[in-house]
């Protein structure tokens, strides 16, 4: 920077935890270059919006956020508005025309250059855009400013995706699947634990693919074993495990290793074989049912989370009924449902028999109502049991109630546990007796 006065930068990260790690890398670079990071956009000289464009709703949220923050250039101190991530990587030409309020666009391959790019903008009035090949792979030697609470962190073990589902734009935005070297992951994990992290959440587009592209026999199981040996680390959580990549050895490791949360996030998307085939998914209904039975048989009490898509092209009433019955029978602990989003450039966008938006919404509501009943019954079954809970703070309604998450609840996406009695500090992992429940949350007392 040319001035000794520190400029303040604020970053808003949208979308998934993988995006959050990218945002933390950019903040790390900026802090290293003597920018001051603030969480208050009103105080910021530079505002960065790290975007998602996976589905229609994500794109709309990104655009709405950009336009809202663009107003800060008129009524606050902001001098630069920067848009980064998947949205400019995918729509750079359109964004330049439609968003003159934005000063710089940066795609998914140029995060490490963020400070350099800002410097290049000095004295220039025209918009700048940097959207090269999406080949960036995070390295533990890169600066990263952790924005999550001190006791929990995400560890991105790979970038990109090579699964090529027919509805998905991720391979074009993030490139092919590429794993980070094992030694580099372990170095970063040690640094996180040294800073007080108790929970590490492993993330990638598909964590089961880890190591298959590396020489030397690296594997997800090997990584987990190395992480479990770290003193001070208490929870290891596995997010985004494709069903066809879940091996018997991984199941046994989840069962036998105390530090691995008895929790697994498996994006199934559907269960009807004709729909799965059109989605270009590799698992069949029979294989999915067999996997779930094996997981529950080998790991009693495991919490299973999945995501499902309704309204995929060609999804018939019978296909949806099969999906609805599957959710009723399987009783997932957590469930995310998405209406199919017709994304240009994907094979499914050109498929015949597109489902109307009205039908998509009806199916979405039916599936969510069904899951609410499943979740309520499941949570009621936990009353009078004991759970380990990570204390995260106070209830939004009253500071008389602590709140936290059990080992079977992931950050941000799952429910919470509210603590009605007992003392604990933020970041403590304590034993709770569950005394009550709602559709998605639990209530309990700390066991003395």
Curated annotation (Swiss-Prot):
Q: What class of enzyme is it?
A: transferase
Residue numbers binding [4Fe-4S] cluster 1: 16, 52, 86
Q: What does this protein do?
A: Catalyzes the methylthiolation of an aspartic acid residue of ribosomal protein uS12.
Q: Name one GO biological process term.
A: tRNA modification
Q: Where is the MTTase N-terminal domain?
A: 7-123
PROSITE patterns associated with the record: MTTASE_N, MTTASE_RADICAL, RADICAL_SAM, TRAM
Presence of the UniProt keyword Cytoplasm in the record: yes
Q: What cofactor does this protein call for?
A: [4Fe-4S] cluster
The UniProt record lists the TRAM domain at 380-448
The alphabetical list of record keywords is: 4Fe-4S, Cytoplasm, Iron, Iron-sulfur, Metal-binding, S-adenosyl-L-methionine, Transferase
Q: What HAMAP family does this protein map onto?
A: MTTase_RimO
Q: What is the lineage of its organism?
A: Bacteria, Pseudomonadati, Thermodesulfobacteriota, Desulfuromonadia, Geobacterales
Where's it mainly located? cytoplasm
Which species is the source of this protein? Geotalea uraniireducens (strain Rf4)
Radical SAM core domain segment(s): 147-377
Pfam families noted in UniProt? Radical_SAM (PF04055), TRAM_2 (PF18693), UPF0004 (PF00919)
Full protein name:
Ribosomal protein uS12 methylthiotransferase RimO
């Amino acid at each position: 920077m040319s001035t000794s006065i520190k400029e303040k930068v604020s970053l808003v990260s949208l979308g998934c935890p993988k995006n959050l790690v990218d945002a933390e890398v950019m903040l790390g670079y900026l802090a290293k270059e003597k920018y001051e990071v603030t969480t208050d956009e009103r105080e910021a000289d530079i505002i960065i919006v790290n975007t998602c464009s996976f589905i229609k709703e994500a794109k709309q949220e990104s655009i709405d956020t950009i336009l809202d923050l663009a107003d800060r250039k008129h009524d606050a101190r902001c001098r630069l508005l920067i848009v980064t991530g998947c949205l400019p990587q995918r729509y750079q030409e359109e964004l330049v025309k439609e968003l003159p309020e934005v000063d710089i666009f940066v795609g998914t391959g140029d995060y490490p250059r963020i400070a350099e790019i800002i410097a290049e903008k000095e004295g220039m009035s025209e918009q700048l855009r940097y959207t090269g090949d999406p080949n960036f792979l995070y390295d533990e030697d890169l600066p990263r400013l952790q924005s999550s609470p001190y006791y929990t962190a995400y560890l991105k073990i790979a970038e990109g995706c090579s699964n090529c589902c027919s509805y998905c734009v991720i391979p074009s935005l993030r490139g092919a699947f590429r794993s980070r070297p094992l030694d580099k992951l372990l170095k970063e994990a040690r640094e996180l634990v040294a800073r007080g992290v108790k929970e590490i959440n492993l993330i990638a587009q598909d964590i089961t693919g880890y190591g298959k592209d590396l020489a030397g026999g690296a594997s997800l199981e090997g990584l987990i074993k190395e992480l479990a040996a770290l003193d001070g680390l208490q929870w290891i959580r596995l997010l985004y495990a494709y069903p066809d990549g879940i091996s018997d050895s991984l199941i046994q490791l989840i069962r036998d290793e105390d530090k691995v949360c008895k929790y697994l996030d498996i994006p199934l998307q559907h269960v009807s074989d004709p729909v799965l085939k059109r989605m270009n998914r590799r698992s069949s209904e029979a294989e999915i049912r067999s996997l779930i039975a094996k997981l529950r048989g080998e790991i009693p009490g495991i919490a299973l989370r999945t995501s499902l898509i309704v309204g995929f092209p060609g999804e018939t009433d019978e296909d949806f009924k099969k999906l609805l019955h599957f959710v009723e029978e399987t009783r997932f602990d957590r469930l995310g449902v998405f209406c199919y989003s017709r994304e240009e450039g994907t094979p499914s966008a050109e498929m015949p028999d597109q489902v109307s938006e009205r039908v998509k919404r009806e199916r979405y509501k039916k599936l969510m109502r069904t899951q609410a009943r499943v979740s309520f019954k499941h949570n009621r079954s936990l009353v009078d049991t004991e759970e380990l809970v990570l204390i995260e703070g106070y209830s939004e309604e009253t500071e008389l109630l602590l709140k936290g998450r059990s080992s079977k609840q992931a950050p941000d996406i799952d429910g919470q546990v509210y603590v009605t009695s007992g003392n604990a500090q933020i970041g403590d992992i304590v034993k709770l007796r569950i005394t009550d429940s709602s559709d998605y949350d639990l209530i309990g007392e700390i066991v003395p």
